[in-house]
Amino acid sequence: MSEPNRNSPLLKPDWQYIEKLSLQDFKAADWRVLNAQRAPYHAEQQVRQVLRMLADSRDDPTFGYRVNNYRHSLQSATMALRDGLPEEDIVVALLHDIGFVVCPDMHGAFAADLLGAYISDRNDWMLRRHAIFQNFHSPERPDVDQQGRERWRGHPHFEWAATFVAKYDQAAFDPVYDCAPLEVFEPLVHRVFARTPQPRPQFQDEVRNDQEQETS
């Protein structure tokens, strides 16, 4: 069913629509209007939509694990919370698999691209590689390289990635674990996303080089 022939609502009643239908027709004044409205829009909507993406998977089925991705994410974050980890690490635990279903083969990069501008180097690095580190804990899985993580041994963030995966990822599939509700983590997510974003082109280049080496 198609959407009705009308504008989508504006977030604020005093905001303006840009009536032109093609970006190439936008004038400088139009871009000034959009740019003035962009920052407050993201400030209000970014975290809301991230959390909604996770919350909407609350009742999703699983393809064999005893918990779905929502419960796995909550368990991971709850374990990090109860271990007294910093807020950033708890938020990373909550969202490390946010793309597991919609972007399964690149879900580490999905999470890193979502969070990377707001988190430390160690967590950006870990997120991009955590799926490969997880293979170490699947000794009888036939379709992965259990020693794939060894290519990065000696890297400053190797031990954190190994620790995160061992304690808060591969061990977070318990159907009777007493998870904290999502609402507990919402203020933490807001505070992380409220940080001044810092682009990470060097990490994108590093991961691209890793991928090129894997296919060469």
Per-region residue spans from a language model:
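Metal-dependent phosphohydrolase cores
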Residues: 1-94, 98-216
